[in-house]
Regions:
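S-adenosylmethionine/decaboxylated-SAM
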Residues: 2-17, 27-232
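Phosphate/oxyanion-binding active-site loops and adjacent basic polyanion-contact surfaces
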Residues: 22-26
Length: 232
């Protein structure tokens, strides 16, 4: 079954039923970025889980004449579920009528990247959140076309993600910071100006606030208090 989605509201009605951490406002950012992809271009997603973000990207990609490469190794673990999560991902993409525009690559992004030779129009990074993996995932930006967009989830929320951005983007010369929607940061592949770097630095108080809240939640759990999940 092939399904056409004419607007964001239509695809979000489908995507919001899929478990995940992407908010409606962040999903709209993905939709807008993918909708502006060039016909025939490729959108790469690193970290797909059960397909919540994949469905949004793929629906917009179809309308734009683009395709999506979804990269996720579907490893075992309490948060991820291994092969069972892959089954759910494939079922969700199929149920959304988007299977024909999604190419699943069930491998680690760090293993796929060295041999990658395709140009990327939009890159969405939401894989493993440790500093070293995110640092490697940011190397995928070398394949993004000039003027293309890079979206990074859990920026200024995850310690590993944020440190990697500060080290490789703030100090780099190829990505311009455009802003964020909660923890979803937006970048453009273009040489940044000093004002762009300053804009990134201004986000640090929000990051420190998030780290403080996360630490407080963990301390609270030690004393038997169970509250909402970590802020994203």
């Amino acid at each position: 079954m092939r399904t056409e989605y004419t607007d964001f509201a239509a695809v979000w009605t489908r995507a919001e039923t899929i478990p995940g951490w992407l908010t409606p406002a962040q999903a709209r950012v993905l939709w807008d970025a993918a909708s502006n992809a060039e016909p025939g271009s490729l959108i790469v997603e690193i970290g797909s889980h059960q397909g919540r973000s994949t469905v949004v990207l793929a629906a917009a990609a179809r309308a734009a004449g683009a395709t999506v490469a979804a990269i996720d190794p579907f490893v075992d673990g309490a948060m991820f579920g291994g092969p069972a999560t892959r089954d759910k991902f494939e079922a969700n993409v199929e149920a959304a009528g988007l299977r024909d525009v999604v190419r699943l690559i069930a491998e680690r992004s760090t293993a796929v990247r060295p041999g990658w030779d395709e140009a990327i129009g939009v890159l969405y990074i939401d894989g493993k959140h440790d500093y070293w993996t995110v640092s490697d995932d940011l190397l995928w930006t070398r394949s993004v076309v000039a003027g293309g967009h890079v979206l990074v989830h859990d920026a200024y929320s995850s310690v590993g993600v944020t440190l990697a951005l500060l080290r490789h983007v703030l100090a780099g010369r190829s990505l311009r910071y455009l802003g964020r929607t909660a923890s979803l940061a937006r970048f453009e592949v273009v040489r940044p100006a000093p004002a762009d770097r300053l804009r990134m630095l201004r986000e640090l108080p929000w990051w420190l606030r998030n780290v403080t809240v996360k630490v407080a939640l963990r301390i609270g759990r030690l004393f038997g208090h169970h509250t909402t999940p970590d802020p994203y």
